[in-house]
Amino acid sequence: YNKSRQEVLVMRVKAIMMPFSKLACISVENTVEEAMKIIDEQGLLSLPVVDGQQFVGVLSKQFLFEEFFRNYTGTREEFAQRKVMEFMKTRIETIGENTRIEEAAAMFITSKVRFIPITNEQNKLLGIVTQQAVFKEYQKIFGNKHNSMAIYTYDIRGVLGRFMGPL
């Protein structure tokens, strides 16, 4: 048994998560303008939305743009002053910090999310795990010592492309 291959089977997302203390988040009470400032300054595509430390949803730059250009009839200034809670997506799957890394990888395959929120039993946001963090961990474990890596997935067009996604 290769010891490093054995370790990946028990690796937990808490080992690779970005902790809450280092995370860019936005409050439900913040404005769209404040959220966009954080998104743009940090080069992000989306932000976790919190109420205190309680995870309540995700705000994506793409969704804000779609809402503004497709559905909004007011001024840009009025839109910028609206609250984040009006635009966040709340039906977001979360995982616990003891979830196995391969389970997180499988979630990335079946969804369009860039990150997965990690919460405790009280829905307190502990951090996030990103696609990039998962792939970096696999790269550390497998490195260049192996000629290939097997990925098992459903036989559906585009699944492998979504799994590999932009890093």
Name these PLM-found stretches:
Residues 1-2:
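Intrinsic-disorder-associated, low-complexity terminal segments enriched in Asp/Asn/His/Tyr and depleted
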Residues 6-22, 60-96, 100, 105-109, ...:
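Tandem CBS (Bateman) regulatory domains
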Residues 11, 30, 34, 59:
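Conserved active-site and cofactor/substrate-binding residues in soluble primary-metabolism enzymes
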Residues 32-37, 105:
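Short, basic/aromatic recognition patches
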Residues 39-42, 47-63, 108, 116-132:
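A glycine-centered beta-loop-beta connector
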